[in-house]
């Protein structure tokens, strides 16, 4: 345990130091647990966020609490915040490694008005118009929840919207149709830009055939946001225990016995907020219900004024392209370029240099002036994707006080705030009024074209993923 003086020098505070190094090959489908006390991944967010805030240290004895949240990332910490603010419940948050060690400090820092991986038109196809409109309202409300949470957190916000770039001419008719739908049906002011306008007034992405601009979208510093959530949760009375993985779980007479290395925590209710780092063994309700997918990210050294001009960067807004295996990127406040996309399929393969090389080549394809630019940061992380591409904030068994918020599919920076509010609502006994499919149904098992769902398909998930990646590449680049 490290102890240090606060900036004001008026009080002592403790930050739990790592006891194990970062594991670059960690794989949630192969590893029994995410480890204990592991250090952060070497991300830009961690490298520039400053010293982590104080925490409550590892669990060191048996204890009785009302509510346990498993996972101290964006979702777990916002759940603790809303439990305290809206219900007067002081949660105990258990984290296996360092606080916000997983998804929350390995993402691209893009807060978009979305969750899951489906477009609004796909919502209509799956759920019907009425439910699609309600899902959109949930995302719009979620963006307001997010804005309210971050207004007093110094997380380098870059507001202004989201630029969705068509990477090929053939994509433009589809993008134009989606924009009309957003305007006419969802009353959401999405505007179409032609390729020349994008390159002249927004960004000189050489692939841009046009773009759709959405009014909602904020770039944030993920590390500063995570640390801000931690400070806020603890100020409201939550206790946050890093280096305290749940290594065993029994439920007897309505009480959950959560075994950690330092003691057993007994709780009346448990919320699960473990994201892409959910181990298969955590609880039977979660086994085989997520497909963790790796995403790579790189950050360059700060661009010079000449490089910024050569790339025609006129915006700091968040940007993605229309590939199925999409790229997400933006110019950061310190004028570095951050860009991310798909990575390896297994944790064992993730450290291979070829995945960084592919991302660098794709960056140069978009911005030829950046060929040879040094990278200051390179990392990868696991994204929690559900088998139907939509999140769930749900109580899987009405007879058990177990709840989860999972499956954001790479759109969790914003929606984790709303999911935290909804998870708190469930835990506090107020969740029965939530009637959208993401609240009323379990995370599904693997399926074949959403027609046949079965846990028996689970061993073949990564075989299917390899096939889909090849198909998506052909769809994105060739066909």
Predicted segments, located by residue:
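C-terminal catalytic lobe of FAD-dependent flavoproteins
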Residues: 7-8, 12-14, 345-471, 475
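Active-site substrate-recognition segment that forms the wall
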Residues: 109, 144, 152-159, 246, ...
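Short beta-strand to alpha-helix junction loop
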Residues: 134-143, 165-175, 212-232, 241, ...
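Dinucleotide-binding Rossmann-like beta1-alpha1 core, especially the glycine-rich loop
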Residues: 114-197
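Extreme N-terminal leader/targeting segments of oxidoreductases
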Residues: 1-67, 85-86
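Helical element adjacent to the flavin cofactor pocket in flavoenzyme catalytic cores
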Residues: 181-183, 206-268
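N-terminal Rossmann-like FAD-binding beta1-loop-alpha1 element of flavoenzymes
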Residues: 65-93
